Amino acid sequence: MNNRKEDMEITSHYRHLLRELNEQRQHGVLCDACVVVEGKVFKAHKNVLLGSSRYFKTLYCQVQKTSDQATVTHLDIVTAQGFKAIIDFMYSAHLALTSRNVIEVMSAASFLQMTDIVQACHDFIKAALDISIKSDASDELSEFEIGTPASNSTEALISAVMAGRSISPWLARRTSPANSSGDSAIASCHEGGSSYGKEDQEPKADGPDDVSSQSLWPGDVGYGSLRIKEEQISPSHYGGSELPSSKDTAIQNSLSEQGSGDGWQPTGRRKNRKNKETVRHITQQVEEDSQAGSPVPSFLPTSGWPFSSRDSNVDLTVTEASSLDSRGERAELYAHIDEGLLGGETSYLGPPLTPEKEEALHQATAVANLRAALMSKNSLLSLKADVLGDDGSLLFEYLPKGAHSLSLNEFTVIRKKFKCPYCSFSAMHQCILKRHMRSHTGERPYPCEICGKKFTRREHMKRHTLVHSKDKKYVCKVCSRVFMSAASVGIKHGSRRHGVCADCAGRGVGTPLDHGGGGEGSPEALFAGEGPYLEDPDDPRGEAEEELVEDEDEDVAKWKDDVGLAHEDALLGDDKDDEDSPQGPHSPSGEPDKDFAWIS
């Protein structure tokens, strides 16, 4: 008993701790942070904010502690109603969502990088959309089953599905097939209360008549039971030719026979048609999931698919292309593969294949189809290596080796190299990522020296400084001194060149002023990039600025070559300037004229 140890967890302590912290927040006890949203002040504790939001964690951890006073944070992006629901969730673990505030709460949680709340709002919206889609789709399907002729079966189904999809604005925002399970409302429509759900599906028949009827469908003949997601590539890319009219007639007859029979049961496939000329993912469906009479979609013409031959004597050989082959050689290679799969001039209806050959045909067809999509002329994945940068060599490394089955994780092309550690943002250049990080930290590293206004980008600060120096932009091209009057740089005097001050025009090209380039009012000192204006080596705009400086240096050198003043003329010019100057001949030549003020 003396050596007994036990680690006990008391769950009631969590609720008690949150309750006490919430009471302290409501009474303003030990609150060391104030969040101002739309003029409303929300008192809170930094520890709670930091532990609940990655945005506050990044903001408060990088700010050095200067005093014990309360920290005031202004949030201009979120709304007061949305932030109130979020801060109540931080102190109580209860999220109050309604149909009125769910959008505001979701946007505020996304800005504060609280993924749990974003997912909860997403599920709330999805549940509301599923209810409306199911009700509308059920009405459409009931009308379709009762009073629609058999010849219009495909159009009626597509109109019913599109009617349900048009209700949901969130379904169009899906960008990744890996996340498609989050809001597959159309798939849930087939699985829910519809009349042709999975519980009503009939088992596949094993008779020879059923086999011959299945061979009429291009989705099951030669092409295999492949589920294609986001396919919008034209069938002409595969090099297939149109079938004879007699074969089209046979297909139409089979469609009418299937429509007038027991009816077909769709598999609940969902096609996200975003990019019309890319084939992103091709996955092989399990053989048992295919239906005996699945209809041909209206946007996939039966005459365009070349993988419709079921010749048992076809030789299936897939040659692995080298990564160093040219694009033309790859296209030629895949064209030969397609010709081998077509098997010459075989009939559309042929004898059934053995299970081994049929499986090999399905796998080889999937590989050839994917590669043909990659090498299509309009495919986004067929870009050259110079567009993709260092990731160009990764383009064909994700192709399946041999005749293996495909999956979503085997085919991915990474285009952006620099990723934000706090959110899902990614960029091609490091300077863009550094600029994006300032949105998380709130840092404004470029202040104006005159008024103190701070900016997140250096070019914005430079543009702002022109407001203070509108009438003070007369700069000598030789000594780079800045003058307030245009007359002081020789604009109104015909004896001097444009943009050259009186001292430099009288001095010639002998020796420029020592204090000219480093003066306080010179543009080099104003925009030299010293102190807080350090140049970003990764900024692509630096090259353009260097070209402007080089052009200016060429203008100065050209002016120096054209002047050609002799040493005696330079001395006479100095004496004349000394006599005209109100300071007298004994005044030092390095001091500026009193008539013109310097810009500090």
From Swiss-Prot:
Residues recorded as bearing Phosphoserine in the entry: 234
Residues in cross-link Glycyl lysine isopeptide (Lys-Gly) (interchain with G-Cter in SUMO2): 229
Bias-annotated ranges (Acidic residues): 533-555
Zinc fingers typed C2H2-type, residue spans: 418-436, 446-468
GO molecular function terms attached to this record: DNA-binding transcription repressor activity, RNA polymerase II-specific; transcription cis-regulatory region binding; zinc ion binding
Record has Lipid biosynthesis as a keyword: no
Region (Disordered): 173-222, 235-278, 513-600
UniProt KW keywords: Isopeptide bond, Metal-binding, Nucleus, Phosphoprotein, Repeat, Transcription, Transcription regulation, Ubl conjugation, Zinc, Zinc-finger
Alphabetized InterPro entries for the sequence: BTB/POZ_dom, SKP1/BTB/POZ_sf, Znf_C2H2_sf, Znf_C2H2_type, ZnFinger_BTB_dom_contain
Keyword Ribosomal protein: no
Main location as per UniProt: nucleus
Domain BTB span(s) in chain numbering: 31-99
Modified how: Sumoylated. Desumoylation by DESI1 reverses transcriptional repression activity.
Gene Ontology CC terms, in alphabetical order: chromatin; nucleus
Superkingdom per UniProt: Eukaryota
Role of this protein: Functions as a transcriptional repressor for PRDM1.
Protein name in UniProt: Zinc finger and BTB domain-containing protein 46
Organism: Mus musculus
Taxonomic classification: Eukaryota, Metazoa, Chordata, Craniata, Vertebrata
Name of the coding gene: Zbtb46
